From Swiss-Prot:
It is found in: Cytoplasm. GO terms for cellular component: cytoplasm. Homodimer. HAMAP family: Asp_tRNA_synth_type1. NCBIfam families: aspS_bact (TIGR00459), PRK00476.1 (NF001750). SUPFAM superfamilies: Class II aaRS and biotin synthetases, GAD domain-like, Nucleic acid-binding proteins. It comes from the Bacteria. Its EC number is 6.1.1.23. CDD domains: AspRS_core, EcAspRS_like_N. This is Aspartate--tRNA(Asp/Asn) ligase. The record marks 31, 82 as: Important for tRNA non-discrimination. Residues 198-201 are annotated as: Aspartate.
Length: 591
């Protein structure tokens, strides 16, 4: 091997030993006739000293520049008193260089590797092979590897089998658009890249592989945001003969062990909260419990007021009027309130009413708000008591359809919590359970809240009689307001699966066309089964403190689903298109 040690492995225990390093020149300094090279590899940095007594190596060190690839032979020694660098893992020692071999030269990089804050993301992605040399980026990928190793070890130890499922499969309605791959051998037909291994892992349960896992690549052709990529990685898990409590316990233990091994963090038992409670208290099915702010329903106090903005939703069975108290924020400027009003409009809110509590003892005169005059004093006091308002607080109100109020005030809760730095802890894991089976659309039709293979907590007859109120056997793990993983007990009886399909408007012939293989499998002794899938990219993003999953993926796509480094997607030549029996209606425009 060309090296004996990684740079980041050097420490005082190696003092006096001769070692060989290979890496990149991170920095070169010439101090009074002595040349210092900071050599960098994936594990860290080491300082190598060259003095004029060794003419050949000194001359070589004098010629090297940043990002040259070098091989260094030298002896580890303690740094002189006063020269210890506490910012480096190997800062107590240095290497006295005996030999220096330049393995390759480098042009000046397109951006400095130690000062990247002013470099645009597109430039960083265009030169990703340079960007990944930065210690911050290398550390994220090292931690990602440790995370997957820990997860694999836990699942292996608990009897799970790592089984690969197909990448080329058929399109199924799973919510997002599929990436389609034309078939050369079947003209006019297309494969689809999997949005998840969902159906294949269920078929593995039917086949008797009762504990399955896979670190799976998944693909979704959807609009991107900070936590989305067109291709992403999933920790996919499925089991037979376990109920939801068993699966929750098994995977929660996995995550607790993971955080202990990788970050040395101890988590207690994760609290459980129903979907209904999460929406009412936090306006979200993935609440961030680090934030102490909560939504409080106040519609019962506003049904009789003349202010239609409140009384309308208060008397609407599908409406909601809720309050959000922000302690100590009564001094908030009007311009800030206007900014928050504009913010909630993104979620469909038509306005943002508020009450500033200056002196409650003075009654309505001690309150500052344009809406106080519309609310009887007794009702006003009940509302302020219910939300726990005291002098110095501000209370915001939302009034509209339940979904709009919940989403708008829920998002405002998160924004204010971040703006005012209200978080009470660093980590807040939890489970959300008892999700509705379906979401009702404006036209009265239904959409599966999770996916159409989730089992309900009722019989097929009860489900078809009351689909709008049916609950599912689904569960989501949430960490700091981010959904880490979602899962459910699956439907394992054909009659139930067909009932769900019917409620989703999938006709029998379409059921056979798209899911015939699954319905066939359910006829042949499918066991009770369920599972869960974690988003690996999101998990690594949270554990590294990254702002985007693009920071924890080696070669991510941009917000427009493009790879600026390889220039993908690209134009395909006419011959390849003919072989695929494809003709373009419009020629692609040159960029």
């Amino acid at each position: 091997m060309m090296r004996s040690h990684y740079c980041g492995q050097l420490n005082e225990s190696l003092e006096g030993q001769e070692i060989t390093l290979c890496g990149w020149v991170h920095r070169r300094r010439d101090h009074g006739g002595v040349i210092f090279l900071d050599i960098r590899d994936r594990e860290g940095m080491a300082q190598v000293v060259f003095d004029p007594d060794r003419a050949d190596s000194f001359a070589a060190a004098d010629r090297v520049r940043s990002e040259y690839v070098v091989k260094v032979v030298g002896k580890v020694r303690a740094r002189p008193a006063g020269a210890v660098n506490a910012n480096m893992a190997s800062g107590a020692i240095e290497v006295l260089g005996y030999e220096l071999e330049v393995l390759n030269e480098s042009e000046t990089p397109p951006f400095p590797l130690n000062e990247y804050s002013d470099v645009g993301e597109e430039t960083r992605l265009r030169y990703r092979f340079i960007d990944l040399r930065r210690p911050e980026m290398a550390e994220k990928l090292r931690l990602r590897s440790r995370i997957t190793t820990s997860i694999r070890r836990y699942l292996d130890d608990n009897g799970f089998l790592d089984v690969e499922t197909p990448i080329l499969t058929r399109a199924t309605p799973e919510g997002a658009r599929d990436y389609l791959v034309p078939s050369r051998t079947h003209p006019g037909s297309f494969f689809a890249l999997p949005q998840s291994p969902q159906l294949f892992k269920q078929l593995l349960m039917v086949a008797g592989f009762d504990r399955y896992y896979q670190i799976a690549k998944c693909f979704r052709d959807e609009d991107l945001r900070a936590d989305r990529q067109p291709e992403f990685t999933q920790i996919d898990i499925e089991t037979s003969f376990l109920n939801e409590e068993d699966i929750i316990g098994l995977t929660e233990k996995m995550v607790r062990q993971l955080f202990k091994e990788v970050l040395d963090l101890e988590f207690g038992d994760f609290p459980h909260m129903t979907f209904e409670e999460a929406m009412r208290r936090y306006g979200s099915d993935k609440p961030d419990l680090r934030n102490p702010l909560e939504l409080v329903d106040v519609a019962d106090q506003l049904t009789g007021v003349e202010f239609k903005v409140f009384s309308g939703p208060a008397n609407d069975p599908k409406g909601r009027v809720a309050a959000l108290r922000v302690p100590g924020a009564a001094s908030m400027a009007r311009s800030q309130i206007d900014d928050y009003t504009k913010f909630v409009s993104i979620y469909g809110a038509k306005g943002l009413a508020y009450i500033k509590v200056n002196e409650r003892a003075k009654g309505p005169e001690g309150l500052q708000s344009p809406i106080v005059k519309f609310i009887p004093e007794d009702n006003l006091n009940v509302i302020l008591d219910r939300v726990g308002a005291v002098d110095g607080d501000i209370v915001f109100f939302g009034a509209d359809k339940f979904k709009i109020v919940s989403e708008a005030l829920g998002a405002l809760r998160i924004k204010i919590g971040n703006d005012l730095k209200l978080h009470t802890c660093e980590w807040a894991p939890m489970w959300v359970v008892d999700f509705p089976m379906f979401e009702e659309n404006d036209d009265g039709s239904f959409t599966a809240l999770h996916h159409p293979f989730t089992a309900p907590k009722c019989t097929p007859e009860e489900l078809e009689a009351n689909p709008a109120t049916a609950l599912s056997r689904a569960y989501d793990m949430v960490l700091n307001g981010t959904e880490l993983g979602g899962g459910s007990i699956r439907i394992h009886r054909k009659e139930m699966q067909q009932a769900v399909f019917r409620l989703l408007g999938i006709a029998e012939d379409e059921q056979q066309e798209k899911f015939g293989f699954l319905l066939d499998a359910l006829k042949y002794g499918a066991p009770p089964h369920g599972g869960l899938a974690f988003g690996l990219d999101r998990l690594v993003m949270l554990m590294t403190g990254a702002q985007s999953i693009r920071e924890v993926i080696a070669f991510p796509k941009t917000q427009s689903a493009a790879d600026v480094m390889t220039q993908a997607p690209g134009v395909v030549d006419a011959k390849a298109l003919r072989e695929l029996h494809i003709r373009l209606r419009e020629q692609p425009k040159a960029e």
